[in-house]
């Protein structure tokens, strides 16, 4: 799936949170591939910058906050501290 397809699934409030979180992790993988780093580097950056652990239980609004940060990384509007 593409980043855009995964983004839509993260935003789809009809899906279970666990499913949406899985798609958020897939978005992190797309960002990692674009930046040439491992997925865990991106997931750690999300946790550091937003306080949201994509591996743990999350709320819907947290997924959207994490997604916004992933979008910023993807578009070069935010930087990794790697």
Map each language-model feature to its residues:
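Alpha-helical propensity feature that highlights long, continuous alpha-helices across diverse contexts
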Residues: 1-82
